[in-house]
């Protein structure tokens, strides 16, 4: 039996690293297609590329073989080559590049904050408010349109070719670091690192409330909310609904009514930090979709309400920033590590909370 992730109840996306955000502004297209195959008990031995080719519509055998060569086909959790002999009750997971886009991506002169660039890749610092990739309703003004302009004189880079370009995504209103592959080989090698979870990324977030512990671990399956397709919701770890997700957090600074934290993802699910923090009662400050624009902690005085309104105006998006990014260079094999300072809106928001808390004493834990 074969199921695409789109066909599985509440189980739309395998990895937030490699797929689109559920934000409508991000569009519906994914960077990769993900499949899971559960082999029947009576299956006779056969090469896995032939087995998959016979069961997958609109996929060539060459496309499947390329996925195997890249390490994107796993059987029972381990990578296999295209000549692997399928056995009864095997569980196969695979990731395939999507075909070329139906809509042409046009180069647009949009400023880019380039942190690093060489012949194989570039690392950019994405501002909040910039959609990563063209999609339904957003075919212009995206990060990929900007990259297409920046690389318009590079003959080998075609922004419409899924074998180059984005390796992972962050939401429209999340700021921070992203890596872009300029060659097919670079994208394959980088994609494998994300697929195998050997990259390192950390986020800074301001959340509502005073977290009890200085550090913690949140575990809970993440799936689309059946009542709101633009939200994700959390189910118990032993649930058959959703995909396993683990978030580690560490407190950086406390402001009584809010807390600045660092988050490291053990998995990469859609809206993982946003959904997990909401789940434990500490949604991200300013995150309208997950309840973070309400006054959830603190006084009810008019001055306090005015302070919160000012903060929400100062940073009118979820207070989340992709601060660090680490991976092995696909050509040199060198470890590459990057850090991005908090953008002005988040830095100013943190400053306002410091000033507020320093002017108030006797604040209780909330």
Please identify what each model-predicted range represents.
Residues 1-366:
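RNA pseudouridine synthases
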